[in-house]
Amino acid sequence: GASGWMWSASRAARVIRFFTFLRHFKGEWAGDPIQLQPFQQFIVGSIFGWIDPATGLRRFRQCYLEQPRGQGKSTVAAGVALWLAFFDKEPGAEVYTAATHRAQAKITWEAARQMVLRSSLKQSISVRVSNLHQMSTASKLEPLGADVNGLDGLRPSGVILDEIHAYRSSGLIDVMSTATGTRRQPLIFEITTAGVGRLGPCWDHHDYTDKVVRGV
């Protein structure tokens, strides 16, 4: 592949197929298995399908996803978070959902929690008040607020950053990105609707992503 990277269709398909073991818990599809739409399969496949052939580790460590409301961002993010926490073969995985407010951070986490409760995953994953935990791997999925104080002890292997258009500074993003340094193949997954104005880290990441897509 380009620059030595390799596309693994099987690695991408494995994570896409994982979603079918999860179930919707809201609206008209509540109770139905999650079938990712083609554009969602592209997102998930792009994250997990590109690897370093020498190490087998993922190529991408950061993903920026900007979509209007109602496009299933939280569903995709919750499934990705569950995979990173409990199926990524990362010893002692720490995956966090974060936002400017804890209530916002809990949206993706609550979606993941409901997915566990409605699937066979609940047989191996403990559903707690404050997190999801798997004793056999010492892994967890947990929501956070945006207070960067006291986060120095975290060693995240995955972070879902929700609605980054509301972030006034890059403080939380920087702290979490730096904290992933000890992990083999960490992922920072930013999800957001479009914001207003060009202040804050969201515009910077939007602009950078646009240039990457256009090959600038």
Write out the residue ranges for each language-model feature:
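Phosphate/NTP-binding elements of NTP-utilizing enzymes
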Residues: G1-V216
